[in-house]
Amino acid sequence: MRTTFMAKASEVERKWLLIDAEGKTLGRLTSEVASLLRGKHKPTFTPHVDCGDHVIIINAEKIKLTGNKLNDKIYYRHSGHPGGLKSQTAKELLAKRPERMLELAIKGMLPKGSLGRQQFNKLHVYAGAEHKHEAQKPEVYELRG
């Protein structure tokens, strides 16, 4: 009888992938990045083991949103104090902290537990074209579709 393969955390091989977000649609990019962070593209994927790769995203400031989402989409955060609910539109967030928009979208697509937090730590988002991970020799990854 054959047994199902279960990867061990010590045996997982991780790559560094570089993705250029220039001109890409937010949702299409983030769903594929979430899949890469989880390791679902690998034949050795195991749900309870972090088998994902490190993902570097550059040019986050040049991401595209379809329709009128730039003005209509609202991001909320709360300070924890009474009356501490803050809100800003996608346009304002893109102007101030463009990498935050990608991080929030990807974080929502990962598991909500310690494994998801571990996978999220392998995401590195930069607003411009420069990044500080040249020593890791990242491979350029082309998105499907």
Curated annotation (Swiss-Prot):
GO terms for molecular function: mRNA binding; structural constituent of ribosome. InterPro entries: Ribosomal_uL13, Ribosomal_uL13_bac-type, Ribosomal_uL13_CS, Ribosomal_uL13_sf. Pfam families: Ribosomal_L13. Belongs to the universal ribosomal protein uL13 family. GO terms for cellular component: cytosolic large ribosomal subunit. PROSITE patterns: RIBOSOMAL_L13. It comes from Exiguobacterium sp. (strain ATCC BAA-1283 / AT1b). This protein is one of the early assembly proteins of the 50S ribosomal subunit, although it is not seen to bind rRNA by itself. It is important during the early stages of 50S assembly. This is Large ribosomal subunit protein uL13. The lineage of its organism: Bacteria, Bacillati, Bacillota, Bacilli, Bacillales. NCBIfam families: rplM_bact (TIGR01066). It comes from the Bacteria. One of its GO terms (biological process) is negative regulation of translation. Part of the 50S ribosomal subunit. Keywords: Ribonucleoprotein, Ribosomal protein.
